[in-house]
Design a protein with these regions (language model features):
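Short N-terminal strand-loop motif that marks the start
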Residues: 1-35
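Reductase modules of NAD(P)H-dependent flavoproteins
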Residues: 2-11, 147, 152-249
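FAD-binding FR-type
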Residues: 18, 29-117, 133, 180, ...
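Short, flexible hinge/linker loops that cap or flank conserved catalytic cores
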Residues: 108-111, 138, 209-211
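Structural motif
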Residues: 114-116, 145, 216
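Ser/Thr-glycine-rich phosphate-binding loops at phosphate-binding pockets of nucleotides
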Residues: 120-125
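Histidine-anchored nucleotide/phosphate-binding helix
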Residues: 126-137
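A short helix->loop->beta-strand "cap" motif at the edges of active sites that frequently abuts
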Residues: 141-142, 238
Length: 249
Protein backbone atom coordinates (compact mmCIF):
# COMPACT_ATOMS: atom_id res chain seq x y z
CA UNK A 1 0.00 0.00 0.00
CA UNK A 2 1.25 3.52 -0.76
CA UNK A 3 -0.06 6.83 0.51
CA UNK A 4 1.53 10.17 -0.33
CA UNK A 5 2.51 12.45 2.54
CA UNK A 6 4.55 15.61 2.92
CA UNK A 7 6.36 15.35 6.24
CA UNK A 8 6.15 18.56 8.27
CA UNK A 9 7.57 16.91 11.37
CA UNK A 10 11.32 17.42 11.72
CA UNK A 11 11.54 15.11 14.72
CA UNK A 12 10.38 11.78 13.34
CA UNK A 13 12.39 8.75 14.44
CA UNK A 14 14.76 7.18 11.95
CA UNK A 15 15.83 3.65 11.19
CA UNK A 16 18.72 2.09 9.29
CA UNK A 17 18.88 0.29 5.96
CA UNK A 18 20.24 -3.18 6.75
CA UNK A 19 20.37 -4.44 3.17
CA UNK A 20 18.65 -4.28 -0.20
CA UNK A 21 18.32 -6.42 -3.31
CA UNK A 22 17.24 -5.40 -6.79
CA UNK A 23 14.95 -8.08 -8.22
CA UNK A 24 14.39 -6.38 -11.58
CA UNK A 25 15.21 -2.94 -12.96
CA UNK A 26 12.21 -1.50 -11.13
CA UNK A 27 11.54 -3.90 -8.25
CA UNK A 28 13.58 -3.86 -5.04
CA UNK A 29 13.42 -5.43 -1.60
CA UNK A 30 14.69 -3.23 1.23
CA UNK A 31 15.36 -4.50 4.74
CA UNK A 32 15.20 -1.95 7.55
CA UNK A 33 16.14 -2.32 11.19
CA UNK A 34 12.92 -2.69 13.13
CA UNK A 35 12.72 0.09 15.73
CA UNK A 36 12.33 -0.90 19.36
CA UNK A 37 8.68 -1.28 20.36
CA UNK A 38 7.53 -1.16 16.73
CA UNK A 39 4.58 -3.55 16.74
CA UNK A 40 2.37 -4.51 13.83
CA UNK A 41 -0.21 -7.04 12.77
CA UNK A 42 0.60 -9.01 9.59
CA UNK A 43 -1.02 -7.22 6.65
CA UNK A 44 -0.44 -3.72 8.01
CA UNK A 45 1.84 -1.03 6.57
CA UNK A 46 4.57 1.28 7.83
CA UNK A 47 5.25 4.85 6.71
CA UNK A 48 8.83 5.71 5.78
CA UNK A 49 10.37 8.83 4.31
CA UNK A 50 13.40 10.65 2.99
CA UNK A 51 13.92 14.41 2.75
CA UNK A 52 10.45 15.04 4.21
CA UNK A 53 8.65 12.97 1.56
CA UNK A 54 6.78 9.98 2.98
CA UNK A 55 4.96 6.96 1.62
CA UNK A 56 3.28 3.98 3.25
CA UNK A 57 4.44 0.47 2.35
CA UNK A 58 2.96 -2.86 3.32
CA UNK A 59 5.29 -4.98 5.42
CA UNK A 60 6.41 -8.37 4.08
CA UNK A 61 8.22 -9.53 7.19
CA UNK A 62 6.55 -11.26 10.11
CA UNK A 63 6.38 -9.52 13.51
CA UNK A 64 8.81 -12.05 14.98
CA UNK A 65 11.55 -11.08 12.53
CA UNK A 66 14.11 -8.49 13.64
CA UNK A 67 13.80 -6.41 10.47
CA UNK A 68 11.13 -4.75 8.35
CA UNK A 69 11.04 -6.14 4.82
CA UNK A 70 9.57 -3.88 2.11
CA UNK A 71 8.99 -4.73 -1.56
CA UNK A 72 8.97 -1.53 -3.63
CA UNK A 73 8.36 -0.62 -7.26
CA UNK A 74 10.39 2.21 -8.78
CA UNK A 75 8.74 5.16 -10.51
CA UNK A 76 11.52 7.03 -12.37
CA UNK A 77 11.90 10.77 -11.92
CA UNK A 78 10.95 11.45 -15.54
CA UNK A 79 7.65 9.68 -14.83
CA UNK A 80 6.99 11.80 -11.77
CA UNK A 81 8.76 9.68 -9.19
CA UNK A 82 9.59 11.54 -5.98
CA UNK A 83 10.39 9.11 -3.17
CA UNK A 84 11.15 5.84 -4.93
CA UNK A 85 14.16 7.27 -6.86
CA UNK A 86 15.58 8.26 -3.47
CA UNK A 87 14.95 4.77 -2.13
CA UNK A 88 16.85 3.34 -5.12
CA UNK A 89 19.88 5.43 -4.10
CA UNK A 90 19.91 4.08 -0.54
CA UNK A 91 22.88 2.05 0.61
CA UNK A 92 23.42 -0.15 3.64
CA UNK A 93 23.69 2.04 6.72
CA UNK A 94 21.64 4.93 5.33
CA UNK A 95 18.78 6.34 7.38
CA UNK A 96 15.09 6.82 6.58
CA UNK A 97 12.37 8.28 8.76
CA UNK A 98 9.67 5.98 10.04
CA UNK A 99 6.38 6.73 11.71
CA UNK A 100 6.21 5.05 15.12
CA UNK A 101 3.02 3.09 14.46
CA UNK A 102 1.94 0.64 11.79
CA UNK A 103 -1.58 1.05 10.44
CA UNK A 104 -4.13 -0.75 8.31
CA UNK A 105 -7.05 -3.17 8.52
CA UNK A 106 -6.00 -5.51 5.69
CA UNK A 107 -5.33 -8.33 8.13
CA UNK A 108 -6.28 -11.98 8.44
CA UNK A 109 -9.94 -12.63 9.18
CA UNK A 110 -10.00 -16.13 10.63
CA UNK A 111 -13.73 -16.82 10.36
CA UNK A 112 -13.40 -19.05 7.29
CA UNK A 113 -11.04 -22.03 6.95
CA UNK A 114 -10.13 -21.09 3.37
CA UNK A 115 -8.39 -17.80 2.62
CA UNK A 116 -8.17 -16.75 -1.04
CA UNK A 117 -5.46 -14.10 -1.55
CA UNK A 118 -5.44 -12.23 -4.89
CA UNK A 119 -2.63 -9.81 -5.71
CA UNK A 120 -0.53 -8.17 -8.41
CA UNK A 121 3.26 -7.77 -8.02
CA UNK A 122 3.87 -5.64 -4.88
CA UNK A 123 0.27 -6.30 -3.87
CA UNK A 124 1.43 -9.74 -2.73
CA UNK A 125 3.32 -8.24 0.24
CA UNK A 126 0.61 -8.40 2.95
CA UNK A 127 0.08 -12.09 2.23
CA UNK A 128 3.78 -12.85 2.69
CA UNK A 129 3.65 -11.39 6.19
CA UNK A 130 0.41 -13.19 7.07
CA UNK A 131 1.68 -16.60 5.96
CA UNK A 132 5.11 -16.25 7.56
CA UNK A 133 3.48 -15.33 10.84
CA UNK A 134 0.91 -18.13 10.61
CA UNK A 135 3.67 -20.70 10.16
CA UNK A 136 5.85 -19.19 12.89
CA UNK A 137 2.98 -19.45 15.35
CA UNK A 138 2.34 -23.08 14.34
CA UNK A 139 -1.30 -22.34 13.68
CA UNK A 140 -3.62 -24.85 12.05
CA UNK A 141 -7.15 -24.83 10.68
CA UNK A 142 -6.73 -22.60 7.62
CA UNK A 143 -5.56 -23.07 4.05
CA UNK A 144 -4.25 -20.19 1.95
CA UNK A 145 -4.81 -19.99 -1.80
CA UNK A 146 -2.67 -17.33 -3.50
CA UNK A 147 -3.49 -16.09 -7.00
CA UNK A 148 -0.79 -13.70 -8.19
CA UNK A 149 -0.87 -11.82 -11.47
CA UNK A 150 1.99 -10.06 -13.26
CA UNK A 151 2.91 -8.89 -16.73
CA UNK A 152 6.22 -10.75 -16.68
CA UNK A 153 7.37 -13.89 -14.87
CA UNK A 154 10.36 -12.14 -13.24
CA UNK A 155 7.92 -9.99 -11.26
CA UNK A 156 7.02 -13.02 -9.13
CA UNK A 157 9.57 -12.10 -6.48
CA UNK A 158 8.20 -14.37 -3.75
CA UNK A 159 7.39 -17.36 -5.96
CA UNK A 160 10.29 -19.50 -4.72
CA UNK A 161 9.21 -18.97 -1.13
CA UNK A 162 5.64 -19.93 -1.98
CA UNK A 163 6.61 -23.01 -3.99
CA UNK A 164 8.85 -24.24 -1.17
CA UNK A 165 5.99 -23.81 1.28
CA UNK A 166 3.68 -25.73 -1.04
CA UNK A 167 6.08 -28.67 -0.79
CA UNK A 168 6.72 -28.44 2.94
CA UNK A 169 3.17 -27.45 3.95
CA UNK A 170 0.80 -28.76 1.23
CA UNK A 171 -2.06 -28.66 3.71
CA UNK A 172 -1.44 -24.94 4.23
CA UNK A 173 -0.65 -23.29 0.90
CA UNK A 174 -1.62 -23.43 -2.77
CA UNK A 175 0.05 -20.90 -5.11
CA UNK A 176 -1.11 -20.02 -8.64
CA UNK A 177 0.93 -17.43 -10.60
CA UNK A 178 -0.37 -16.13 -13.93
CA UNK A 179 1.12 -13.78 -16.53
CA UNK A 180 -0.92 -11.38 -18.64
CA UNK A 181 1.55 -11.04 -21.56
CA UNK A 182 2.34 -14.60 -22.63
CA UNK A 183 3.38 -13.56 -26.14
CA UNK A 184 6.08 -11.15 -24.96
CA UNK A 185 9.60 -12.42 -25.61
CA UNK A 186 10.46 -11.90 -21.93
CA UNK A 187 7.95 -14.64 -21.13
CA UNK A 188 9.07 -17.08 -23.82
CA UNK A 189 10.03 -19.73 -21.24
CA UNK A 190 6.81 -19.44 -19.26
CA UNK A 191 4.73 -22.62 -19.27
CA UNK A 192 2.26 -21.79 -16.50
CA UNK A 193 -1.18 -20.24 -16.42
CA UNK A 194 -1.82 -17.13 -18.53
CA UNK A 195 -4.34 -14.32 -18.34
CA UNK A 196 -5.05 -11.45 -15.99
CA UNK A 197 -5.58 -12.65 -12.46
CA UNK A 198 -9.04 -11.06 -12.31
CA UNK A 199 -10.01 -12.98 -15.44
CA UNK A 200 -9.04 -16.39 -14.05
CA UNK A 201 -10.43 -16.03 -10.54
CA UNK A 202 -13.86 -17.57 -11.15
CA UNK A 203 -12.35 -20.60 -12.91
CA UNK A 204 -9.89 -21.00 -10.04
CA UNK A 205 -12.65 -20.76 -7.44
CA UNK A 206 -14.55 -23.50 -9.24
CA UNK A 207 -11.54 -25.77 -9.78
CA UNK A 208 -10.49 -25.43 -6.13
CA UNK A 209 -14.04 -26.09 -4.91
CA UNK A 210 -14.14 -22.91 -2.86
CA UNK A 211 -17.51 -21.67 -1.64
CA UNK A 212 -18.83 -18.57 0.14
CA UNK A 213 -19.60 -20.67 3.19
CA UNK A 214 -15.96 -21.58 3.78
CA UNK A 215 -13.86 -18.94 1.99
CA UNK A 216 -12.83 -15.31 2.54
CA UNK A 217 -11.50 -13.43 -0.51
CA UNK A 218 -8.87 -10.67 -0.35
CA UNK A 219 -7.48 -8.48 -3.15
CA UNK A 220 -4.49 -6.14 -3.05
CA UNK A 221 -2.89 -4.21 -5.90
CA UNK A 222 -4.09 -2.44 -9.02
CA UNK A 223 -7.46 -0.69 -8.45
CA UNK A 224 -8.85 -1.98 -11.74
CA UNK A 225 -8.04 -5.55 -10.80
CA UNK A 226 -9.63 -5.08 -7.39
CA UNK A 227 -12.84 -3.65 -8.84
CA UNK A 228 -13.23 -6.58 -11.21
CA UNK A 229 -12.43 -9.20 -8.56
CA UNK A 230 -14.80 -7.53 -6.12
CA UNK A 231 -17.65 -7.54 -8.64
CA UNK A 232 -17.12 -11.18 -9.55
CA UNK A 233 -16.79 -12.61 -6.05
CA UNK A 234 -19.53 -10.41 -4.62
CA UNK A 235 -21.84 -11.71 -7.31
CA UNK A 236 -21.02 -15.19 -5.98
CA UNK A 237 -21.73 -14.05 -2.39
CA UNK A 238 -18.15 -14.29 -1.08
CA UNK A 239 -17.03 -12.07 1.77
CA UNK A 240 -14.40 -9.66 0.44
CA UNK A 241 -11.64 -7.40 1.77
CA UNK A 242 -9.50 -5.04 -0.32
CA UNK A 243 -6.33 -2.96 -0.15
CA UNK A 244 -5.96 -0.47 -2.99
CA UNK A 245 -2.86 1.17 -4.33
CA UNK A 246 -1.24 2.11 -7.58
CA UNK A 247 2.35 2.84 -8.45
CA UNK A 248 4.09 4.93 -5.84
CA UNK A 249 6.05 8.02 -6.79
Amino acid sequence: MTIQKLNKNNHLPTTTVIDYENKTDDLRIIWLKKPANFDFTPGQYCTIGKNKIERAYSIASSPHEEFLELFIELVPENDGGVLTPQLWNLKTGDLVTIRPRAKGIFTLKEKHPNQLFVGTVTGIVPYVSIIRNYIHQNKIGHKFYILEGASYFDEFVYDNEFFKLMKSHPELLHFVPTISRPDDIKNSYWNGITGRVNNIIVDQINSLNLSPSNTMVYACGHPGMIEDVKAKVSNLSFEFLEERFWKDD
